[in-house]
UniProtKB/Swiss-Prot annotation:
Predominant location: membrane
A GO BP annotation: intracellular manganese ion homeostasis
Signal peptide: none
Annotated stretches, region: Cytoplasmic metal binding domain (MBD): 86-161
Protein name: Vacuolar iron transporter 2
Function: Vacuolar iron transporter involved in the transfer of iron ions from the cytosol to the vacuole for intracellular iron storage. Vacuolar iron storage is required for seed embryo and seedling development. May be involved in the regulation of iron translocation between flag leaves and seeds. Can transport zinc ions from the cytosol to the vacuole.
Amino acid sequence: MVKEFVQDEEKQRLLLDEHTEKHFTAGEVVRDIIIGVSDGLTVPFALAAGLSGANAPSALVLTAGLAEVAAGAISMGLGGYLAAKSDADHYHRELQREQEEIDTVPDTEAAEIADILSQYGLGPEEYGPVVNSLRSNPKAWLEFMMKFELGLEKPEPRRALMSAGTIALAYVVGGLVPLLPYMFVPTADRAMATSVVVTLAALLFFGYVKGRFTGNRPFISAFQTAVIGALASAAAFGMAKAVQSI
């Protein structure tokens, strides 16, 4: 038997204070980190493997790799900024359009509220007071329509800059991993072998952590991430060897 909800604000507040949500809510930040680190680990790794396949000395591999990391971080960060800015612009355009509809056709918009609530199993006698309450509060009405009709969340004001910085920094951190051996190992062959071991270990670790955060199976995620990185570097190495033999 379902217990009735008691409309006691003080009791509700106590219940909410006692309950700790276990949902992970920093999805956008994690997404940016995943994008930056995954590309940062893979692209410089493939570049270093390709140059090593062409018998380039460690100094050249390191120089080219660092240049790629710098360019990649700027490019990825700019891409993240533009994507977040585009999302914010889209939200504000829809916000303005929805406000105009509330002002010009309020009855139609109220009917849409009723339709949305009816999809959750509420009858007219139940959603009627909710519709009337929202109509008396224009700000809440607009927020309700944006969230439940259009499925749009209000973006954070600094989201674009945060996304750009997070992706760029994550790319640099990931990109330095495959290049570290070339800083300390003088011969290119040994540096490449060390880079392969270090980067594959980093890819496995990153894939495992990514799986834990995203709710996927960690070991499957680790394996998939490592395979993608290995295939990219192997393709670059093989291409360099093929071109060199021509």
